[in-house]
Amino acid sequence: MNYRRLTEDEILRLKSQSCLADDWGKVTVAEEFSTEFVHHTRFSGEVCLGVFHSEFMLPGGIRKHSGLRHVTLHNVTVGDNCCIENIQNYIANYEIGHDTFIENVDIILVDGVSKFGNGVEVSVLNETGGREVLINDKLSAHQAYILALYRHRPELIARMKEITDFYSNKHASAVGSIGNHVMILNTGSIKNVRIGDYCRICGTCRLYNGSINSNEVAPVHIGHGVICDDFIISTGSHVDDGAMLSRCFVGQACKLGHNYSASDSLFFSNCQGENGEACAIFAGPYTVTHHKSTLLIAGMFSFMNAGSGSNQSNHMYKLGPIHQGTLERGAKTTSDSYILWPARVGAFSLVMGRHVNHSDTSNLPFSYLIEQNNTTYLVPGVNLRSVGTIRDAQKWPKRDGRTDPNKLDYINYNLLSPYTVQKMFKGRETLQNLRHASGELSDIYSFHSAKIRNSALVKGIRFYEIAIHKFLGNSVIKRLEGIDFRSNEEIRARLKPDTAIGSGEWVDISGLIAPKSEIDALIDGIESGKVNRLKSINAEFEKMHSNYYTYEWTWAYEKLEEFYGIKPEGMTAEDVIHIVEKWKEAVVGLDRMVCEDAKKEFSLASMTGFGADGSRLEKELDFEQVRGDFESNPFVMAVLKHIEVKTALGDELIGRMQRVSEN
């Protein structure tokens, strides 16, 4: 924008409107500037003003014309059509965009050169330090995972810190920015904070040293009573109602409120925190805690629901709060659960009761951990048939609140993936070895300071086998869909993987599921200096995410021989039919188990408390009016439809394979 100096006439008019300046020569204005809407304003340092043409329509039908009233500006650029009034102290060292509304604020300033929260060290997982993550505007859950957990590679950590420092220094400035269409109302102190477009800050107490990365498609809302120090808040997030954050990163579309308190913590996409407390936690995508009595401390979580009163301890009153733990993706805690760190809980497991024996159940996913008389009992695989697990898997993609097209986290929602299925292979082998070592007639088996009952062990093996059948069958059907094969050779050619990437171990790096070989290749690239920018690291994660199904097939192809005893390179149509029959059996069997589990929610016991003051018939009628009946429940109907669709899908492939067999 071209600015001009004020005319003598304009200076006189401004003075008559109670305006002052240390040096009127340093006040420059837009070509069409009018003094009409500038009153009781003091200027110092270099000040640039835009035009004041438009009005703001406020709730209650009040109109306010853009302009400056009762404000002190020091080294400030004000864009077109802004309304700034009733600033108790001053605004210093800021560039303010157009159409921004700032009213009744204590002070807004940048003091010295600031990095606006970039480069702040967050002591995640270990309160005493050693796993610090340097936060930045482009931080993804996957970057943070590597930086926090791969400390056995010091060269990698040094390089990643270097990359973040480069970014932080590049964006450091002695001048802050407030974007376009921003609203800041009834707010206390804002110091060293960069504020993006379309942000709403209303009734906030204090913001110090941070970035609010709001934009038009994903605005950020900061609400009443909020206090944030040393922070970064990403697009589409809401921090409201007395939340207090200190040294925290808040990812995209997160919601923190109702007096939630967090320090040294990272919250990634779609996390929710209300009422409770977080300390040194790594909250991967969809970590949700709603209750006042819940403390999450020194743990790594993702796709997690914390029950009321869920607590952990990272302190054994010896060398300080030095312990940490992990609940792998999809793990949940019930009310009043407690875990003494260190411990590791397998994916999609449920934790009930108090667990103090440092169990590691990472190779037994989909389990229940239940405490009886201070002993941890493990029920392996049982969560595979839980209606809650299936409901969770369906709800997460629907609850993705990210509207920003530039997504920081690459989230894989699959319940069954090479990551979880490889653990089922290990879990099945572990359970078989336990049975072999202790004898088939043992009542109780011991595993990593946990106990497994005989019946639970036998069922666990069966659950894992059903899930493996389902996953491998899904992969084969997907690979062969939509093609009319004329010979076994054509089938084998189609089954052959497109790439060698995908074999071996897979990892879940906080939402992104990828082959370990690819993560290692990225790490080698960072160490060598080949990958040396934050955007390059994120581009590599995006590539892994977009190639997931290609890599997944490579892994599944190799597992066909291990599980079915069939060499894939010699596979025939009959072999495919055998796999699909097993798959149909697994899918339908699992869906029926899920339906049976859902049916418990419609039992007579579930009707307790319904039909107040009435007979049993009235109880049933009241229940039906409130909850509906089993047959018409949307979830149950979806499961029954799923059985129908999957059976038809399997039959269609079997039909194609039979035509090959007949040739």
Region spans (language model):
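Extended non-catalytic interaction/regulatory regions in multidomain proteins
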Residues: 1, 22-26
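Intrinsically disordered, low-structural-confidence terminal and linker regions
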Residues: 1-9
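Glycine-rich hexapeptide-repeat left-handed beta-helix
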Residues: 13-21, 29-52, 56-68, 77, ...
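Right-handed parallel beta-helix
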Residues: 61-69, 164-185
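Long, charge-dense tracts
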Residues: 89-90, 94-96, 100-101, 106-116, ...
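Long, compositionally biased intrinsically disordered regions
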Residues: 111, 372-663
